[in-house]
Regions:
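N-terminal "arm"/small-domain region of PLP-dependent enzymes with the aminotransferase-like
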Residues: 1-32, 37
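Hydrophobic/aromatic ligand-binding patch that stacks against planar heteroaromatic rings
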Residues: 93-94, 147, 176, 193, ...
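PLP-dependent aminotransferase class I/II
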Residues: 10, 22, 39-45, 49-55, ...
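Conserved active-site segment immediately N-terminal to the catalytic lysine
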Residues: 157-195, 225-229
């Protein structure tokens, strides 16, 4: 049996090695390592895939969130509603820009931000909502957009974990996550469903003027070379990463299907185990399974994590400490917040290996070891 990995980028690379190597060679031969034509080509291809009007590539997913908030001209003291149960980058940029994070609960089934909690958190200072499409499943965007329209709020979708996911509106219309709100952001970190071989990120929007502003901010605020109209940053997707992503984009839907097959295998393996709650699929979302995250009941999660490691089965805890309890947010007194759903989840979730290259032998071994511990 091949070594089991949480993410197997090497085996995936071997399947498309010829195309990837040629794409990288073309960039090297051109010497256009920064802002080469392949960057714009990738942006156009991604926009077409997403059915978004504009895609603005940048250096990483965290920068994408920061550039989005800068582009919307959010001011110090403005409140931004965000889940606490998320990767820290979502919330970190809010504090970095001296905005005020307002942490709210998630839906215990979908792990995504709870629309009822959003509505209850809106104040006169609220300017934006940041829904996170966590683990590969969409947040309840129709309800979120209704709230945003009612209170005239921006919506910045953190789509780092759900690129390729479809949201299905109540009228049957489908839209890709990240294209529904004011701005969508994503990360091309290597472990992502569409991952580079280094860092990378992007923003997407359908707003003409906003797209111009986002492009400027990502490149030192330049309107043209050496003319800087806005305060910006140095956040560019390099040409080699763009070339890699441009090739991998062709396989994104295929990768999502492979992930769904893995998820289906796990579902069947754990179907008769009451102590393992497998991922819920919302009727309004296609799940692209960036992670396969289960909730444990009556099981010592940390001991399972340790046992699996001893059995050469990697697993991860996403996330052991929610944002509102992190020291970096002490100035907001957020640790005092009563967030029972978030606290409950952080004690019980565990993520199993999830990627496109898992085979049946590996999956049988993983699931058998999980059940061996759980059924003790």
């Amino acid at each position: 049996m091949r070594q089991i990995q949480m993410v197997d980028t090497q085996t995936q690379y071997q399947r498309i090695k010829t195309e990837i190597d040629l794409a990288i060679k073309e960039v090297i031969d051109s010497s256009a390592f920064i802002n080469g034509k392949i960057v714009q080509e990738f942006a156009l291809n991604l926009a077409k895939y997403l059915d978004a009007k504009y895609v603005v590539p940048c250096a990483n997913g965290t920068d994408a969130l920061q550039i989005a908030m800068m582009g919307l001209e959010l001011k110090p003291g403005d409140e931004v509603i965000t889940p606490s149960f998320t990767y820290i980058a979502t919330t970190e940029v809010i504090a970095l820009l001296k905005l005020t994070p307002v942490f709210v609960e998630v839906d215990p089934q979908t792990f995504c931000i709870d629309p009822v909690a959003i509505r209850n958190a809106v104040t006169s200072k609220t300017k934006a909502i940041v829904p996170v499409h966590l683990y590969g499943q969409s947040a309840a965007m129709e309800q979120i957009m209704d709230i945003a329209r009612e209170f005239n709020l921006y919506v910045i979708e953190d789509n780092a974990q759900a690129i390729g996911c479809d949201y299905i509106f109540s009228n049957g219309v489908r839209k890709k996550t990240g294209t529904i709100g004011t701005i969508g952001t994503t990360s091309f970190y290597p472990s992502k469903n569409l991952g580079a071989y280094g860092d990378g990120g992007a923003l997407y929007t359908n707003d003409d003027q906003l797209a111009v502003k986002l492009k400027m901010i990502a490149n030192h605020g330049q309107s043209k070379r050496y003319y800087h109209d806005l305060v910006g940053c140095n956040s560019r997707l390099d040409s080699i990463q763009a070339a890699i992503l441009n090739e991998k984009l062709k396989h994104l839907d295929e990768y999502a299907e492979a992930r769904r097959r893995v998820a289906g295998f796990y579902d069947n393996a754990f179907a008769d185990c009451a102590k393992i709650k497998t991922p819920f699929r919302a009727s309004y979302s296609d799940h692209v399974f960036h992670q396969y995250t289960v909730i444990l009941e009556g099981v010592n999660r940390d001991e399972l994590h340790k046992f699996l490691a001893e059995q050469k089965v990697p697993s991860m805890i996403y996330y052991p400490v929610p944002a509102h309890q992190q020291k970096m947010f002490a100035q907001y007194n957020s640790s005092r917040l009563h967030m029972p759903v978030t606290d409950w989840l952080t004690q019980r979730v565990i993520s199993l290996p999830m990627h496109t290259e898992l085979d049946e032998e590996q999956l049988n071994y993983i699931s058998s070891k999980v059940l061996e511990f759980v059924n003790r």
